[in-house]
A protein has these predicted regions:
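Histidine-centered divalent-metal-coordination microenvironment in nucleic-acid enzymes
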Residues: 92-114
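Signature for HUH/AEP ssDNA processing cores
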Residues: 36-97
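Eukaryotic short linear interaction motifs
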Residues: 61-63, 100-101, 116-117
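Generic hydrophobic secondary-structure signal
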Residues: 52, 56, 105-111, 126
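Catalytic "initiation/cleavage/transfer" segments centered on a nucleophilic residue
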Residues: 1-46, 113-214
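Generic alpha-helix signal with a bias toward terminal, lower-confidence helices
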Residues: 63-68, 103-105, 121, 203
Length: 214
C-alpha cells in the first residue's frame, strides 16, 4: 500500500482518529475505511461486541522473515479456533517494520460479546498458537512451571508504560455506547497511522483483515 491517501483531519466518518496536523502525523484512509467497515459490520451482527487489541512480536534473536507467511498462518489458525469456540471473531491487523522494534504486527479483534466478557482467554490462546507456529520449545519459570514467552502483548500498557484498559464491551443499549464506540475507533486508528520509520520491503502486504459478511 504505497502512494495511498493520507488524512490529517481529527475525524473519519464522524469518529475521532489519532492525527496531529502540526506534527504531520496522519492516518491512511484505506485502513480507516476497512476499520469502519469491520466495526460497523460487527455492531450490526451483535448487540454486544467485545473490542480488544493485541500485538504480535518475534522473540529476540529470532530471524525475522521478509514475508508475512508465519503471521498469516498463525492468524488464520487463531481465528478458526475462536470461530469454533463460538465467538464469531472479526479482525484487522497491520504489519509494522521499524529499525528499533523490528517486524511486528498490531491487531484489533472484535468478538460476540454475548459469548465472552474479557480478553484473557483470547490472549492466552494467541500466545499458545503463536509459539506453536514458531516451533518454540516449551518454556518454564523458576519454579519449573510452564509459562509463555510473552510474545503477544495484551496492550494493557501504553507506549509510556502507563496502565491502560483493554477489552471494551460495546452494548447497543448502553447510554455510553457512542462514546465507547468512538474511543474504540480512535484506538483502532493507531493501526492506520503513517509510520515515518517504516522499513518494510516494498510490495509487501501490510494490511490483513477478516472478510465482511453480507
Amino acid at each position: 500500500m504505497r502512494n495511498e491517501r493520507i488524512t490529517y483531519e481529527e475525524q473519519y466518518q464522524g469518529h475521532p482518529i489519532m492525527t496531529d496536523k502540526e506534527k504531520q502525523l496522519g492516518c491512511k484512509e484505506a485502513i480507516l475505511q476497512k476499520i469502519d467497515q469491520i466495526m460497523t459490520d460487527m455492531s450490526n451482527r451483535h448487540s454486544k461486541v467485545l473490542f480488544m487489541r493485541y500485538d504480535v512480536r518475534f522473540p529476540k534473536g529470532y530471524g525475522h522473515p521478509n514475508d508475512n507467511e508465519l503471521f498469516s498462518q498463525f492468524q488464520e489458525t487463531f481465528i478458526k479456533n475462536r470461530k469454533r469456540a463460538g465467538y464469531d471473531p472479526a479482525y484487522i491487523a497491520v504489519r509494522e517494520c521499524s529499525r528499533e522494534k523490528h517486524q511486528h504486527y498490531h491487531v484489533a479483534l472484535m468478538l460476540d460479546g454475548h459469548k465472552t466478557q474479557n480478553i484473557h482467554d483470547h490472549i492466552q490462546t494467541a500466545e499458545r498458537l503463536w509459539e506453536k507456529t514458531l516451533n518454540l520449545p516449551p518454556k518454564n519459570d523458576d519454579a519449573r512451571r510452564t509459562t509463555s514467552y510473552g510474545l503477544i502483548d495484551d496492550c494493557m500498557r501504553n507506549r509510556q508504560g502507563q496502565p491502560q484498559g483493554n477489552g471494551v464491551m460495546l452494548r447497543r443499549d448502553d447510554p455510553e455506547y457512542k462514546h465507547k464506540y468512538d474511543q474504540c475507533f480512535r484506538r483502532c486508528s493507531y493501526l492506520a497511522k503513517v509510520n515515518q520509520k517504516d522499513s518494510s520491503p516494498k510490495h509487501q502486504r501490510e494490511v490483513f483483515s477478516s472478510r465482511i459478511q453480507h
